[in-house]
Amino acid sequence: FPFTERGTKAEDKQYTFRVEPSYVNALLDMGVDVASLANNHALDFGPDALLDTFTTLDEAKIPYVGAGATKERAEEAIFVEAGGRKVGVLSASRVIPVVEWNIENCQPGLFCTYDSTRLVQRIKEIESQCDYVVVFVHWGLEKKTYPEEYQRNLAKQYIDAGADLVVGNHSHVPQGIEYYNGVPIVYCLGNYIFNPNMMDTYALKVVWDVEGDTNLQVIPVDTREYLTGELKGDEAQAFYDYLEGISFGVNIDENGIVSYK
């Protein structure tokens, strides 16, 4: 959502959102290192609201990806240090309500990936600048458990270009996990906090081992009463079983550790 108190609501859009800039403190309290802005709500209240979002995040010293005042900035990667290694983060959207939101058509705007060419190129450009490349993509259909075929095809193109992890969002419900050439694709994490009618979701712990392999641990959570809490015991196991069932060729053990068959 844009951090703003101004702007004009987008026409012919059922759901539009914005939040007071002071709520950026919630991201700070959570320890957010990078914010992804490539989604179908970033321009709900127009370009001024998106510019306010950039300002709010800059003042909070939270780097952002997936949007910018210029094409160069929207396509820019953010590099973060984790465990003594350098991780490059890119973000793009495959879901926007009108073509004018695409940075190719307006500024400010969003980095989009309806055509994979530009994101593939950016992955190749930053691969040599970091140890790992993580790609976040806003894609798919809302409330759909399984990814669309285009999601699977795009993810494989990103991995062929050099991505070490692909993580998606947008469907509002969890989607499964798949490995391609040993690289994990997490199609959708669901909602971290949202409508209480969509309670099942999960967080993801990522560990790169000394061989450079990407290891995943699923942390199952629910969002009852608009609060996110970790599932334990039988509830956690039920979620592991469910997620394994909607995934592609993976096992999830009793601790949430993911492996491919």
Where are these regions (language model features)?
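Acidic, metal/ion-coordinating pockets
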Residues: F1-K261
